[in-house]
Amino acid sequence: MSHAPRYAELRCKSCFSFLEGASHPEELVGRAAELGLSALALADVNGLYGIVRAHAEAKRQGLPLIVGAELVVAGLAPGRPARLVLLAQDREGYAGLCRLVTRAHCGEGWTGAPERRERDAVAVPFEAVAAGARGLFALYPGADGDAVARLKDAFGRRAALAVTRHRVAGEEARVLAARSAGRRLGVPVAVTNDVHTHARARQVLQDVLTCVRHGTTVDRAGRRLFPNAERTLKGPEELARLWSDFPEGLAAAADIADQCRFRMEEIRGEHPLPPVVVERGALAGGVEVATSSPAQAAREGARTATPSLSLRASLPAERPAAPEPEGPAASAPEGPASSEPGEPGLAGAGGGTGAAAGTDRDGALAGMSLLRELVREGARWRYGGEPPEDVARQLARELDLVESLGYASYFLTVWDVVRFARSRGILCQGRGSAANSAVCYVLGITSIDPVRMGLLFERFISAERGEPPDIDVDFEHERREEVLQYVYQRYGRDRAGMVCEVITYRGKSALRDVGKALGLSLGQVDRLAKLIGTYEDLGQVGPELLAQAGLDAADSERVRMTLALARELQGFPRHLSIHVGGFVITRRPLCETVPIEPAAMPGRTIVQWDKDDLSELDLLKVDLLGLGMLTALSRALALLARHRPAPASPTAVPHPDALATIPAEDPEVYEMLGRADSIGVFQVESRAQMSLAPRLRPRNFYDLVISVAIIRPGPIQGGMIHPYLRRRDGKEQVRYPYAPLEPVLARTLGVPLFQEQAMRLAVIAAGFTPGEADELRRVMTHRRSHEKLAAMKARLVAGMAERGISGADAEEIFKQLLGFAGYGFPESHAASFALLVYASAWLKRYHPAAFACALLNSQPMGFYAPHTLVEDAKRHGVEVRGVDVGCSGWESSLEGAAPGRPAAPGETAVLRVGLHAVRGLPRAVGEAILEARAAGPFGSVAELVRRARLSRAWLVRLAEAGALGALAPDRRDAVWRSLAVEADGGDLFAGLAPPEPEVALPAASAADEVSADFATTGLSVRGHPMALVRPGLGGDRIRTARELGRLPDRAPVEVAGLVIVRQRPETARGIVFVSLEDETGIANLVVMPDVYERFRPVVRGAPFLLARGRVERSGKVVNVRVDSVAPLALAPSMGARARDFH
């Protein structure tokens, strides 16, 4: 029996070659280890997108992973650009590889925001490859003599030719040509297999992907498809047989692999953040501050300075009601800094990520000096003087840990970004585990006092965790772009990039692409795709559903294959998008750590790794997130500042930049939330939250914290909601598993809801340090390592035994910990969001017009469409007026009793819908109308057209929307007349023909008017559609939403309405929840799985529903359990678009 040779596969594409490879990186690595390969090189096309996933799996398998990429190179060989595989030999080579991939996507010498190229147009010139060849090994799958000579000149002994043997015509001639060129030019020739799949069974999917890439079908693809399944991973024995005539080719591949010693582990936690440079003696407390970017720091005298923000001393309430608007700092620079590259290292530079990563300890100490001074100033600002003793101790402890771990620059970077936002009047607030940090609180990053709330700092950072911290900051979503561009311009695009998000195939998209590739008709593909929701499992598509769609898998082999292949395709990457807010910022050029490419959105660049990739390598990121509610709150406060009530009003308006001044703990606010009057209120407007509210009956801020946390998948799956509510109602005794745990669980009535409680339980019951408790939480949450979990259990049980807890009791406590450590919600995160719950609820309670107006102007956001927000405002006594070219601004606004006039002090504000509500109307057209109206009101439609230079199309659009107001009160007449008006305001046929006789158009009915409103604006201020159609629904048989509350439990009932929300949460085991709106309110339907399957098309698609079922009552919570549903026949346009959540 012959001994198998050593062999390493050097050319391997994964699915991250985007439609070129048909296997996940993890599958390729696992199969390579199974086959006994000595190493595997992952070389995806123009990218390192999948390399971290492959690296993680290679660590688990113990397989050496070579980092590479297959670049499209222009100018290497005659004709079309050639493919060239580059493999990193060392850290320098890896940096060069990242630079070359970046160059391919961004072009030469990019400094601004490069334009995105189509994937087929991404290429790099050979001159750039030759210039960046150090530390790289080049593998060329060709035999052109001139190209081989050029490669040898550029790479020397670090170049080789690649040959393959796939049993196709003409292949042997190419192998002979390559071997001949190699001998002639002294270049080694290595055997490779140009791998596209990890197993032969994936070849069918590979063919489908090829068809998708070329926009063709399997019947028409021809030679674009591989003729066989030979491009799969093969073991050394199989290749030895295949290449028995050329064993030295296999040896060459193994030798090349031995030369490529770079491993991804080398960049773990490598890059510190760039410093935040502050001039000596220029700290807070009313003293002017200047900060400098790395680019500025490289140029002498490049400093910017502006007057500092005033530091308003204010002692926070027992439980802060809303985020503070200012911070312990000077102002941000007047404008973004230059983005020229420069090496940092000036005095005052912040520290990096630890000495192990090469941090300059002098720089770190300087950074800590700055951070300590800012914390001192911030503590005085937060507490109106010296902080309480317990706060001072906590701050000192946190700062010592931050210094020992080298994270000063991370805190300073986030502080700098938050400071910039506040200096521009952009509302922002930190959340997540960062709210456990007293340092973040006094720096103004977060708004929760963690000491007063008893939060654990180790949930945020611990020495035992060995991972970098993660600070999430929310900004107004409409102004976040200002913050993002500030980061780009301050640190330079070569040192800052947004984290990518990999958009993968889901059920619908997989079905559509596979169906088209297999040649199904567009109708068949459409019917298949409509069978499932976006995120539903294709395994749910059975014969019954296919029959509903007019398809039969038994009769159609292609339908069966479509379903099977679509299931395989689910989870494959389709393209890259932008992460919701993650930024990577580095001291050295970022493109030496990870390739950068332009994002689809202009002005943005992204790295080729997602957040999980960065986490795997312990690379720091800053999360700058957009939050619609912050936009709405900012807009509401600005509206109130402009329409301030009379000074004697009991609901004095807060300062527009100071949510913190909203009155805290208002009983009226809690009473409103307790009756589930929460449409538009942050986090508590969902159907589940509304069902919870009457049972929870919040009475204070901490009740809102619990409300935010309890309606989550974890507590629901853990069965914690009902025990907590029973104990709150006095129907169940409060019990504690171990008496000393009462202080930990008392606030949640003995029911563990928060991750911090799990950590404190381990500290008290087993003597864990807080850092060890956080490690326990992480092990229990992820449960990836049975060994770690077993070790933690042994440590926990031993600690409890030392405290007199018996083995049986200890086992029970461990089971409880295991049960809720993973699903528990972070208390700090819930508290941060609860601030916004209270602030938005206060505005809704006391200023419903301003609140509704702000919500309309902040769309898209929240749970409900504009129509539902308008109906809710009307139920709260707000007068709403429709779109009118004579009164409306571009956005919705507040006006007084006189149309188009601002409300006088003390006058009740009226909500005027803005021109932005008219579907399809460009903002430029709206602005032109406003500019023309500023010179005086319009006297006629012709004058409007002439002065605003409106085209006939836009005039007709406005007329259809009923927006011509007093100029043409009758909508039909307005549309008719608009069709005969030219852009200059004259009649189209004036002077060419006798005057047209007046046309007596029939008056539109109320139903026609409402239908036209919905068709053109998505909402109607005239009335609800159900009020118009109810008289024809059979008298009192069909109940209104308001009447449901008076019916007894299990009473048979029929209800009808407009579908405003559909939900099918994963935790509901197939149950669908539908919210129906009528003229009196909202009715909640519960559609069980069997009913849903029978009426799936109606439930999923009908805009209006008539439902029959029985009343389900639980206290004040009323639902309708549905037995059957039917579409309610109304005009197709008469309805808003439902918000569907799957």
Swiss-Prot record:
Family assignment from sequence similarity: Belongs to the DNA polymerase type-C family. DnaE2 subfamily.
EC number: 2.7.7.7
Biased composition (Low complexity): 311-320, 327-344
Pfam families cross-referenced by the UniProt entry: DNA_pol3_alpha (PF07733), DNA_pol3_finger (PF17657), HHH_6 (PF14579), PHP (PF02811), tRNA_anti-codon (PF01336)
Keyword Zinc set for record: no
Superkingdom, taxonomy of origin: Bacteria
Lineage of the organism: Bacteria, Pseudomonadati, Myxococcota, Myxococcia, Myxococcales
Region annotated Disordered, chain positions: 291-361
Protein name: Error-prone DNA polymerase
